[in-house]
């Protein structure tokens, strides 16, 4: 497995930034998908919909994976570092709906990584969670919103004196987090758990892998408000701004309906 991971992620262990959804790909294309890329993502979306259907059965039956009940989100502490403080300031610039989503993404993503037994860079994951959707509230025609999120993250990293390689690893994870079908081998833990944590909150995906007590604690700390409605509006605005992008495809495939049907009250 280690050899396979190195071959796909590169000798440095970092994901290939030129892969679909990566930092350099997003900069080069502004997020516009080719016909072949759309076909690949459609297949990944179909797999995700099937997994969601099976997962909802697990959720209804209360079937948790081994170790899920042993994870306690109350023990998760924000890192104390200059980068974390920069990310917190950047997070506070966002609309209230995105601020709450950002912190819930952090908690849900960490819980999933703990259940999966996956090591995360806790500082980078915290900061990525807080800033991953920074650009979504101000969609730019023809330019994927993850670029603005990545740029804000790179500014945080520069202000905190973070090395370029480490900063670009985080920016890459933010760019790829909206790509259906991410994998640990190709996309690395940061990008995967940014997506998976965000999707627990956004559409209830993998909620069946999080203990109910942890879900309740996350919502107690960061209430959802009217998040379903607000998220659907943001997704539709991004899809209108970049119709050939990933959110354009996701909206056409019915993800707003999945958001409305998520197992949350709002």
Language-model segment annotations:
Residues 118-124, 161-173:
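Acidic/histidine metal-binding catalytic segments
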Residues 121-140, 145, 149, 153, ...:
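His-Asp-centered metal-binding catalytic motifs of divalent-metal-dependent phosphohydrolases/nucleases
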Residues 106-109, 149, 153, 157:
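Buried hydrophobic packing segments
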Residues 2-72, 93-118, 162, 179-266:
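Divalent metal-dependent phosphate-bond-processing catalytic cores, especially two-metal-ion Mg2+/Mn2+ enzymes
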Residues 91, 113, 134-138, 157, ...:
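Short amphipathic alpha-helical interaction patches enriched in hydrophobic/aromatic residues
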Residues 94-103, 138-150, 163-164:
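Active-site metal-coordination segments of metallo-dependent hydrolases
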Residues 68-75, 82-92:
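Glycine-rich, flexible beta-strand/loop modules in the N-terminal catalytic cores of phosphate-handling
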Residues 76-84, 119-128:
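Short coil-to-beta-strand
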């Amino acid at each position: 497995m280690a050899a396979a991971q190195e071959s796909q992620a590169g000798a440095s262990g970092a994901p290939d930034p030129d892969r679909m959804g990566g930092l350099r790909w997003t900069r080069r294309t502004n997020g516009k998908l080719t016909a072949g890329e759309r076909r690949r993502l459609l297949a990944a979306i179909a797999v995700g919909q099937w997994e969601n259907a099976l997962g909802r059965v697990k959720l209804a039956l209360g079937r948790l994976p081994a170790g899920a009940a042993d994870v306690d989100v109350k023990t998760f502490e924000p890192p104390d570092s200059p980068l974390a403080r920069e990310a917190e300031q950047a997070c506070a610039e966002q609309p209230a709906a995105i601020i709450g989503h950002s912190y819930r993404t952090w908690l849900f993503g960490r819980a999933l990584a703990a259940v999966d037994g996956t090591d995360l860079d806790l500082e980078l994951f915290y900061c990525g969670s807080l800033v991953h959707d920074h650009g979504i509230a101000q969609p730019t025609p023809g330019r994927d919103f993850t670029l603005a999120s990545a740029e804000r993250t790179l500014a945080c990293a520069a202000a905190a004196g973070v090395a370029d390689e480490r900063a670009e690893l985080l920016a890459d994870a933010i760019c790829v987090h909206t790509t259906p079908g991410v994998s640990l081998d190709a996309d690395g833990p940061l990008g995967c758990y940014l997506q998976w944590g965000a999707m627990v909150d956004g559409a209830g995906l993998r909620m069946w892998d999080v203990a109910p007590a942890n879900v309740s604690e996350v919502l107690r700390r960061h209430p959802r408000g009217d998040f379903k409605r607000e998220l659907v509006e943001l997704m539709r605005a991004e899809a209108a701004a970049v119709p050939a992008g990933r959110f354009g495809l996701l909206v056409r495939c019915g993800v707003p309906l999945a958001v409305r049907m998520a197992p949350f009250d709002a």
